[in-house]
Amino acid sequence: MKISRTNVIIAILIIAFFFVINYLQPLRADDFGRAYTDALDKGFIIYFRGIASNYIHWTGRISAQALIYLFLSKKYIHLSVFMINMINSICFYLFVLYSYKIVRFKTKVELFSKDFLIYFFFFIFLFYQTGFIANVIWKTAAVQYFWGITLLAIFYYISVVKNKQNIWFSLFTGFFIGLYNEIFVGVAIILCLAYFLNQKLSQKQINKNILYFFIACVIGGIILIAAPGNYVRLNTMSAGEHISVLNQLINLVTQIVTKPGDTLIPMLMLLISLVLIFTNKNITKKASFIHGVAIASSIFVLTPVAKSYDLNQRVLLIYDAVFFIIMMQQFYNHSTSFVLKLRLRLNSLSWVFLVLLVMQLELMATIYFEIYKFERYRDTLVTYYQQNEISDPILPMIPEFSQITFIDDITSDENAYNNDAYAKFYGFDKVYGKELG
C-alpha cells in the first residue's frame, strides 16, 4: 500500500517531537534500581534468575520485568537510554496512528486533515492533563506500561478494524499481556467477556483473533496472579492490613472522589463515553448495555491496587487509553445530528486548534528542557563529589513543576528508596536531598 508523502512527514514530526521529550526526561526512581541491577551484563543466567527472584519475592509481571532488565543496563546506560527513547518515540507514533484508525474504523487514513488535527489536539491535551504522557516517558513506565498499551492498540486494529486473522500474533499478544500487568489482564478479560456475550446474544461469529488472545491472556494471567511475589508486594504496600472486600470497594470509590487530580479526567472520559454509547442509535440497546456495563465495571479491577498503594496516574494509564479511544470512537461515529454538527463545527475551527496544539507542544518542550537543564547541573555536582571521593553528598532536589509532570526525585530522607537507588547507581553510600534556594 502506497503511503502518502504528507503522512510520512507527519510521522517523522511526531516521532521527532516525542524523541526530544523522551531525551529530555532524565532517569528517575525505579530507573536507577533497574539499571544498577545490570542483570543482562552479568549473563543470561543472572538475567533469568533476577526475573525468577522477582516472581517469587516481588511481582509476577514476567514479560514487563524481562523487558526492563533487557533494555536498562548501567554498563551500557547511554545505549540503553537511547534505545528506550527511540522505541518509545516510535511507540508514540504507532499509538497515535492506530488509535486514530480504531477511532475512525478505517485501514487507511490521511494525517494531513482537519479530522486528524482535532484528534491529535485532544490526544495531546487530555493525555498531558492526565499525566499519561509524563508517566510514559519515564523509562520504567514506558517499558512496563506504554509498550503494552501500544501492542494492544495494534492488536485491536489488526483483529477488529482490519479483520485480518493471525492466530500466532493473537496468542503472543495474549500471553505477553497476561504476564505483563494484572490491571491490563483484568480490563482485557472483562472487555473480551462482554464481546463474547454480545456476539452470542446477537448470534454473530466470534473473531478468532480475540478468542485466541483471550485464552492466552487468561493462561498468562493465571501465571501472573499466582506469583508469590504479588502477595509479598501487596502485603508490604498495605503494611499487612487486611480489610473486607466491601471496605476495599468503599476505599476505591473514596479515592476516585477525593483524588480529582488523578481521576477527574479519566472519569469524565468514561462518563462521556457512556453517554455517547447509550445515545448512539448505530448500536443496539442490548450491545450498549453489555459494553457500557463492562467498561464501567472495569474500574473495579483497581480495588486491590487502591487498598495496597493508592490510586495514581501510573495505574490509571490503561484506563486513560481505553476511555479516550472509546470516547473518540463514539464521537466520530455517532448517529445524532448534534454530534455530527459539533464535529463539523470543530473542523471549521481547525486553525484555532492548530495554534492551541503548537502552544501545548511548546509548553511541554519548555518544561522538559528546564528539567533537563536542572539534571545537567546536578550531574556536574555528582561528578565533583565522585572525583573528591565524597560518599554521602547533599544534592538539590528538582522543584515541582506541576502535578502532570513526573518528578519522583530523591528526597530529604536518605533511607528512601529513590535515594538508595540513586546512591547505588552513582556509587555513593548515602544521598541527601535538599530544596533549591
Regions found by a protein language model. Give the residues of each.
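Short hydrophobic alpha-helices at membrane interfaces in multi-pass membrane enzymes
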Residues: 158-176, 211
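Signature aromatic-anchored transmembrane alpha helix within multi-pass, membrane-resident enzymes
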Residues: 166-167, 334-360
